[in-house]
């Protein structure tokens, strides 16, 4: 029904078109639009503007043309201003949708700091009882071993940026398997998921420069696909894409 009415209006418009060229077609359409609208539903001020837009003044009527130009300028400003408001609303809506999406995807537990494991039993319990979707990064260290302090500091920063990843640390002497983690293989990183060891890095400090920081450790773990996408980074990227648009 609606499609038939729209087609009929288009045919009527084609029959009433009297101008040629882009400006003539636009003026014909404005005039037809005004006539086809319910007169009671159009505010008087809008109706007057539509009339003026559909019936440009003659070049000899200087005063009328100036008045028309002023009204057109105001109308154009309002339209542009409204378009900008619409764009801002759309950006806010898309940003909110992205935030909602990340919240829905981030339905697992959140941590945000490095857990100190005191015993081997606590170590095993953490691996076995944590949710299967959670990635667990365990740093096995000892005081005084080169690279251990820097790695602990780096993991503390990463824990804040990746709250869905559980970062832990435990002294080799507290694991109950100190003979397996001698000083020459420290610091060691073990990565678990779903109760299974998925990556292990012995003497991991050798992968970095003499001085290394959180960004270096982050890049290293990302090379092996062990970290999820940072939530803050994803939202910033979305905001940048919206600004480009």
From Swiss-Prot:
Function (record text): May participate in the regulation of visual phototransduction or in the integration of photoreceptor metabolism. Inhibits the transcriptional activation activity of the cone-rod homeobox CRX.
The species this protein was found in: Equus caballus
One cellular component term from this protein's GO annotations in UniProt: cytosol
Protein family according to the UniProt entry: Belongs to the phosducin family.
PTM text: Light-induced changes in cyclic nucleotide levels modulate the phosphorylation of this protein by cAMP kinase.
Basic and acidic residues bias (residue ranges): 58-67
InterPro entries membership: Phosducin (IPR001200), Phosducin-like_reg (IPR051499), Phosducin_N_dom_sf (IPR023196), Phosducin_thioredoxin-like_dom (IPR024253), Thioredoxin-like_sf (IPR036249)
Keywords for the protein's UniProt record, in alphabetical order: Cell projection, Cilium, Cytoplasm, Nucleus, Phosphoprotein, Sensory transduction, Vision
Positions of region (Thioredoxin fold): 111-245
Protein name: Phosducin
Gene3D superfamilies, alphabetized: Glutaredoxin, Phosducin, domain 2
């Amino acid at each position: 029904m609606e499609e038939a009415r729209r087609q009929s209006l288009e045919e009527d418009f084609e029959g009433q078109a009297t101008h040629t060229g882009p400006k003539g077609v636009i003026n014909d359409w404005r005039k037809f639009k005004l006539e086809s609208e319910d007169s009671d539903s159009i505010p008087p001020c809008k109706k007057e503007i539509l009339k003026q837009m559909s019936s440009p003044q003659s070049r000899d009527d200087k005063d009328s043309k100036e008045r028309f130009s002023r009204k057109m300028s105001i109308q154009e400003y309002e339209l542009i201003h409204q378009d900008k408001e619409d764009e801002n609303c759309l950006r806010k809506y898309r940003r909110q949708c992205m935030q909602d999406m990340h919240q829905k995807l981030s339905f697992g537990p959140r941590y945000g700091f490095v857990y100190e494991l005191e015993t081997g039993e606590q170590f095993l319990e953490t691996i076995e009882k944590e949710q299967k979707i959670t990635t667990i990064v365990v740093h096995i260290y000892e005081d005084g071993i080169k690279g251990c302090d820097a790695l602990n500091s780096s993991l503390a920063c990463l824990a804040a940026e990746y709250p869905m990843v559980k970062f832990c640390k435990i002294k080799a002497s507290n694991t109950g398997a100190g003979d397996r983690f001698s000083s020459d293989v420290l610091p060691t990183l073990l990565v678990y998921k779903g109760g299974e060891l998925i990556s292990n890095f012995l003497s991991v400090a050798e992968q970095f420069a003499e001085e290394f920081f959180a960004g270096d450790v982050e890049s290293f773990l990302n090379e092996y696909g062990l970290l999820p996408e940072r939530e803050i980074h994803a939202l910033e990227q979305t905001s940048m894409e919206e600004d480009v648009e």
